[in-house]
Amino acid sequence: MEFIDRNKFIYVFKYGVVSFLNYDEIKISEFIQLITPFCKNFSGLKLSEEFEIETGSNEIRFGFNKIEIIKPTTDIFRLIMLNVSQSVALDYYYEVTNTLLIETNLQTQYLEKKGKLNISGRDLKKYIGRTLNLKSNIAENLYIFDSPPETWEDEDLNRIDVGLKRTFDLQVRFRSIQESLQIIKDNFELFKDIMQYRNSYVLEVIIIILILTEVINLVIEKLM
């Protein structure tokens, strides 16, 4: 997290989200352009979320896309920016997962209508790899069910963390994505089994044909 001046912060996360506090659109665009050449696997998908922070309240309150806090501190700002960034990250993972789910459904519909798969073994392996890689990235980068260490001994920080997770429905959305990924993985594993059975059947037919050919050759040799 970079402290720019007393009221401005930039928080860059390893999973590709950048969170800004008290920056206008022009400055945000300039910073994104500045860091883009240094990004790995840069995604053209632009997702954003705005969240309002009001200070000077007599107690901590949560509203629609808003939080009211008593006194602003760096730890509070960091915690808020962390939760907002995880909400945006979940939006991204939802989009990617939904695309995979649509592609999987197309294959199941084709299987239902034609009784066969419309995908090669190589492409199937790629889909399985994408699914496993996505599950791994989510597990590695998001801490939906864990709280940052600074909240363990600070009642206000813990209350803010719990409240923000509830406000953004982080746990519900996380479970939904995980369930969708499991469905996708199960379907692809089923496709793989079908493909292996098909390849095994073709191999058996080839072996039978070879045996019959050998038998026919032996019969012809005896008759000649």
Task: Explain the meaning of each model-derived region.
Residues 102, 106, 193, 221-224:
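Perimembrane helix-loop junctions in membrane proteins
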Residues 112-221:
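Membrane-associated alpha-helical segments
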Residues 2-122:
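Extended alpha-helical interaction modules
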Residues 39-41, 46-50, 166-167, 179-181, ...:
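Short, surface-exposed, polar/charged, turn-prone segments marking secondary-structure boundaries
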